[in-house]
């Protein structure tokens, strides 16, 4: 996800948090999209409509916030081992960064936020951003509950994974199908809106 920090997010965050409070949730409620869909953890006692209302609020935030994103996907069954996966992802990310060089070179600093969830991903990002090493700062002390953009990125990745599964001829999981209510609803209310935020 890319965000120019000169573009203020405070109004978008306030609207999101007001809307969560209107649902009876804590204003600072951290939205975890996977558990929300699967009805796990803090969402275990919520019905589908209650959970969908939460995701609707996050979708509204994503639509209105001054952000864009790029998702890198690959099919592991066509790659032999971790090294091949690493190399394919690295190539895709570096190609994207080179394509976006004119935009990225306008900035004096690039901040890269990652929560250290997977050390191999952190290392992959360090390698990819080596071409901007002199102005890239890695911020790894990232806690999802403190960063709405991190939660938005989680939502986008979850939806893109569902889209990738469908495009690859796989089926949605039972919990995904029950939550989204069919492919028409998924396309109309989720895939189409996030597609407008794809980095061109």
Predicted ranges, named:
Residues 1-200:
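Phosphate-ester processing/binding pockets and catalytic centers
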């Amino acid at each position: 996800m890319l965000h120019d920090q000169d573009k203020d997010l405070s109004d978008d965050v306030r609207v999101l948090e007001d809307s969560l409070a209107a649902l009876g949730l804590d204003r600072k409620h951290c939205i975890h999209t996977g558990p929300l869909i699967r009805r796990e953890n803090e969402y275990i006692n919520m019905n589908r409509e209650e959970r969908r209302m939460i995701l609707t609020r996050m979708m509204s935030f994503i639509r209105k916030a001054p952000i864009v994103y790029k998702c890198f996907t690959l099919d592991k069954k066509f790659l032999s081992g971790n090294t091949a996966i690493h190399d394919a992802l690295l190539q895709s990310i570096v190609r994207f960064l080179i394509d976006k060089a004119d935009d990225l070179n306008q900035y004096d600093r690039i901040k890269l936020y990652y929560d250290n969830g997977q050390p191999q991903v952190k290392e992959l990002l360090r390698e990819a951003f080596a071409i901007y090493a002199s102005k890239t700062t890695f911020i790894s002390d990232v806690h999802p509950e403190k960063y709405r953009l991190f939660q938005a990125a989680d939502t986008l990745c979850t939806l893109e994974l569902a889209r990738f599964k469908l495009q690859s001829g796989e089926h949605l999981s039972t919990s995904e199908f029950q939550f989204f209510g069919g492919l028409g609803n998924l396309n109309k209310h989720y895939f189409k809106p996030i597609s407008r935020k794809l980095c061109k």
